[in-house]
């Protein structure tokens, strides 16, 4: 069972992840307006989206190493403050204060640097949660990952209708700064999650984290990382291109686009929560955690792939909503499983660096995907982009399934 302070710290991590995705995804919500105002092609828009990941990817690896070395409380606060201020700055792009397209690029780079702390810090705290509760605890990460775009899409669409896209960035950034107050006050739960009290009388000495070189030598690490790479490719395709596809290719209004996009995120939250609950329940009843997680992964990805393949040709509101919901529900358990698998195989002492590097390499799809998709859309339209995305997530899952037969802790050699 989780103590009250640790549970509160994990809830705050989930809120930070939601804010993380609200702020980074705001550029996609505003994409139809930003593209028109700055005259961006699909390829150049893809570069703007991709620029975030140029700093986010190395920041994840650095934060994973730092999370095993210094206070998660301080590291998280510094990162959140950095990305919140960058988000506010996005609201001044093109006004003479923050420049135009160059300002967009620079602020996205700063935002990526700050946002890199969230997942390694969250995994560091959650790795100490008992296995039978770890799935639902990870909903704070994967649920925030879906809740953020949902809130960002709905609230962002409303703010843009009332005031404009610049005001949307300012409101989102200010809301993120407010989060720092409860986080800084949650010291006890954060320290418990870090294992600061494991060396109290009667407790065994805390384990030293595995060396980074030992993590990188593990074939299982690379299989999980490939799975992460393919899974995030699918997510970033949805986050970055579903709104544009609905407006530019299907002719929906901004309001209709926000409602349809929100269907994906609502279904993602439902699928992720139900999947985590089912796995945790099976484990508490004596089920094999490795077997249940593998089954859930294959079933979820299959539903997501089918949805991606059928979406480009679907006609009518009801079939469109149904397919978007199926794709989101299928994708829902995937992010949760990515983190649970990494935390389980790394162990509590090494979860920060394992998940940090795993997430760092996995998010290379954020650099490659938006630009590649932009080139495909400019050259051949949206349908091939959906097909390529489905193929990538399906292939990554297949390779993982063949390479990792059991999801269990790695036996690290003594340092």
Where are these regions (language model features)?
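C-terminal ends and interior cores of transmembrane alpha-helices
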Residues: 81-98, 302-315
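Juxtamembrane intracellular "pre-TM" segments in multi-pass secondary transporters
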Residues: 1-2, 191-224
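C-terminal transmembrane helical hairpin of 12-TM major facilitator-type secondary transporters
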Residues: 290-338
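Central cavity-lining transmembrane alpha-helices of secondary-active solute carriers
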Residues: 50-65, 262-275
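A late C-terminal transmembrane helix in Major Facilitator Superfamily
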Residues: 343-379
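Cytoplasmic helix-loop-helix junction between adjacent transmembrane helices
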Residues: 105-146
